[in-house]
Amino acid sequence: TLARQLANTSETAVEKLKSRLREARAVHCFALGAQDTALASLLQHQLLPAGIAINLCQDASLMRMTASTLSDDHLLLVLVTAEADTVLQSATLQARTQGVTIIALTPPQHALANMAADIIPLPDSPQLARYALLLLVDLLNDTLMA
C-alpha cells in the first residue's frame, strides 16, 4: 500500500507544499481527534529541524480564535483522516474568508477538500491515511533538508 500511496502522491503537490511552508510568515495546523492530533503533532516535530515551526491547534475554540487572526501570508494545514466535525469545517471556512492559503491533508472527496487551495490526497481508510501521512512527512523531510 505504501508503493501505491507513493505513486498517488504528486511530486508537484509535495513541491508546492514545501514551497508554501518555506514562504509562509506563519504555519498553522488544525486537527481534531486522537489519530489526527497525534499525526499533526508528529508533523510539527518532524518539520521543526528544517526550520518550519507549526502552530498546532487541536482545540475547537482555539481553532476559531486562530482562524479569525490569520491573513493571506499565513499557511493553514488542515489534517483530517476521517470525518471532520462541523467545528473544524467552520474554523476552516472562517480561515478561508480571511484569505489564508489552505492545504488539506484529507481524502479527496472530503468536504474540507473543497475549502482548500490545494489538497494532498489521503486514502479513505483512516489506517491507510495514517501510513500515507507518515510517508508524506518523510518526503517533506527529505526535500526540506536537501
PLM feature spans:
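HTH-adjacent hinge/linker in prokaryotic transcriptional regulators
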Residues: 1-13
